[in-house]
Amino acid sequence: MKKYRKILAMLAVLAIVLVLSGCSNTPITDKSTGFWDGLIILNFSRAIIWLSNLFGHSYGLGIIVFTLIIRIIILPLMIFQTRNMVAMQEVQPQMKALQKKYSSRDMETQQKLQAEMKKLYAKHGVHPMASMLPLLVQLPILIALYQAIWRTQALKTGSFLWLQLGSKDPYYVLPILAAIFTFASSWLAMKSQPEQNGMTTSMTYLMPVIILITAINVPSALSLYWVISNAFQVGQTLLLQNPFKINREREAKKQAERDRKRTLEKARKRAIRNHKR
């Protein structure tokens, strides 16, 4: 399981690098070519501008609506990923028991461990890699959305509320909101896990700082995207991975197991007393 966590962490870092690397790319125009620029990002850019015109040439609303549309489109992938992750968390105690049982490092024992793990995964309908496939599909979409907003020059000429979309937020409202929503979504997801590791905890506190510093120094169009996307992520986490509900259910299961063991122990003692009579 640690191996898969490391892979997920590496993917997260890769996503950050790819997203931030988009800051130095050239503007997207009708003359942009190639699969990534000419097909993906250009059409994302056109969709945002079309929506902006639909809402009275408001580029701010265009960014908001298109961001929400993209997040809703990839929501089924998130549902699948979250359910698989929750199922993986639930089988953790059984996985640890198997690892303890087959703790020897010789090849034969490790083969038995792998066979038992496969049976456990099949029984509960989960697989570690199943959580990564949706992530690999989502990342290019979200990166394309990010770059479409960053590299579409027309979006930087508009205004929205107190913002000039091509300039930094003068009051730092959007950077602060983006950081708050980033922390909230990460914290909620972390609290839903039965065990928190150091990597998860570090990223929960590190990512909001990165988002805050970056959002302070980029045009408001990009900060607006981060606010909407991360606010959606908070709602999504509360819907799919609500830690308060999950922890209540987890505690109820533990209490039921304690009650079952207590009942069995009482029955055992009663049987011993009756036998002595």
From Swiss-Prot:
Domain of life (superkingdom): Bacteria
CDD domains linked to this entry: 5TM_YidC_Alb3 (cd20070)
Region (Disordered): 251-277
Lipid-linked residues (S-diacylglycerol cysteine): 23
Membrane topology, from the record: Multi-pass membrane protein
Basic residues composition bias: residue spans: 267-277
Extent of the signal sequence: 1-22
Biased segments, Basic and acidic residues type: 251-266
Cellular component per GO, a single term: plasma membrane
Keywords annotated in UniProt: Cell membrane, Chaperone, Lipoprotein, Membrane, Palmitate, Protein transport, Signal, Transmembrane, Transmembrane helix, Transport
Location of this chain's protein in the cell: Cell membrane
Lipidation (N-palmitoyl cysteine): 23
GO BP: any one term: protein insertion into membrane
GO molecular function, one term: membrane insertase activity
InterPro entries assigned: YidC/ALB3/OXA1/COX18, YidC/Oxa/ALB_C, YidC/YidC1/YidC2_Firmicutes, YidC_ALB_C
TM ranges: 35-55, 60-80, 130-150, 170-190, 208-228
Main location group: membrane
Cysteines joined through disulfide linkages: none
Cited function: Required for the insertion and/or proper folding and/or complex formation of integral membrane proteins into the membrane. Involved in integration of membrane proteins that insert both dependently and independently of the Sec translocase complex, as well as at least some lipoproteins.
Stated family: Belongs to the OXA1/ALB3/YidC family. Type 2 subfamily.
Name of the molecule in the record: Membrane protein insertase YidC 2
Gene: yidC2
